[in-house]
Regions:
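An acidic-aromatic
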Residues: 43-94
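Residue-level marker for the onset of beta-strands and adjacent loop->beta junctions
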Residues: 32-34, 43, 56, 65, ...
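Glycine-centered tight beta-turn/hairpin loop motif at sheet-sheet or coil-to-beta transitions
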Residues: 29-31, 53, 73, 121-123, ...
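Beta-strand-dominated lipid-handling architectures at cellular/organellar boundaries
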Residues: 16-20, 39-41, 59-61, 66-68, ...
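Bacterial Sec signal peptide processing site at the extreme N-terminus
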Residues: 2-20
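Residue-level detector of beta-strand face positions
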Residues: 24, 48, 66-68, 118, ...
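Mature, soluble, non-transmembrane domains
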Residues: 6, 78-167
Length: 167
């Protein structure tokens, strides 16, 4: 027997959540594997990316329509709908707001559960490839110029806000 296996998408409740895991970034020029710690409280996101040996590569914060990328003292600010201007990513419009809902298994505005494990928005294609009891565990976000793969190691769901801390 062969065929497709349907994944049941269990959405993470809105509010305060975080996860830790691995992020694979692939472009035509490079391939990197980073550790990721993503903290979300309502509309505020804080993402810490670390490279080999746990060295912090970047902190990304999205709050009130602004995206702030801190790469070890080099801080760049974007409006949420701005295109990225970093080397290698010129003109690339990343769906930051939508992504914070998609990784939880929700539609773009967070109100409804995704009806499929796949979402297409512009040139971006998001897919949940594995789910667990706590929520999505493996996901991909693809664009003709870049492919991101996310593997969640641990979800933490909370009803109350807590400061960013190590999982």
């Amino acid at each position: 027997l062969s065929g497709c296996v349907a994944h049941r998408i269990e959405p993470i409740p809105p509010g305060v959540w975080r996860f830790s895991g691995k992020l694979s970034l692939q472009t035509s020029e490079e391939s990197r594997i980073l550790s990721i710690d993503w903290y979300q409280a309502g509309e505020v996101s804080e993402i810490v990316l670390k490279g080999p040996l746990g060295v912090k590569v970047a902190t990304i914060r999205a709050d009130q329509g602004e995206l702030i990328v801190d790469r070890g003292g080099q801080v760049v600010r974007y409006r949420d709908d701005d295109v990225l201007m970093q080397t290698g990513f010129e003109g690339l419009k990343l769906p930051w707001k939508s992504l914070s809902y998609w990784v939880r298994g929700h539609t773009e505005h967070g109100g409804q559960q995704l009806t499929s494990s796949e979402v297409k928005r512009g040139d971006w294609y998001f897919r949940i490839t594995e789910t667990g009891i706590e929520g999505p565990l493996a996901m991909t976000l693809e664009h003709p110029r870049v492919k991101l793969r996310l593997r969640v190691r641990q979800w933490v769901i909370s009803a109350e806000e807590t400061p960013l801390q190590k999982i």
